[in-house]
A protein has these predicted regions:
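Conserved, structured core segments of small domains
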Residues: 1-94
Length: 94
């Protein structure tokens, strides 16, 4: 199942820098492992924002929820999810 996920990160401006740096490092390692595992298929930055659009390939809604809620930055994210389906005019199967 493919899902388009929009993530907006909103870390409080007064958050401890050492804490947020460590959190960002954990987030990077975790997200890169999900990419290597084929679960996080695409990751695109939104220009001028601390946000991204991503495509996840997971087995269920519950699996996606578990992955997203396990992200180290999850408590600081606003997330919206859109389920995707193959378009009949697409020349490449997804």
């Amino acid at each position: 199942m493919l899902f388009l996920v929009h993530m907006i990160v909103q870390i409080p401006p007064d958050a401890d820098k050492a804490f947020t740096d460590a959190l960002k490092a954990e987030e990077k390692a975790f997200s890169q492992q999900l990419q290597r595992d084929g679960k996080w298929r695409h990751l695109w930055r939104v220009v001028g924002e601390y946000a991204n659009y991503s495509v996840f390939d997971v087995g269920s809604n519950d699996e996606l929820h578990e992955l997203l809620s396990a992200l180290p930055l999850f408590p600081y994210m606003q997330i919206s999810v859109t389920p995707l389906a193959q378009h009949p005019s697409a020349i490449v199967a997804n």
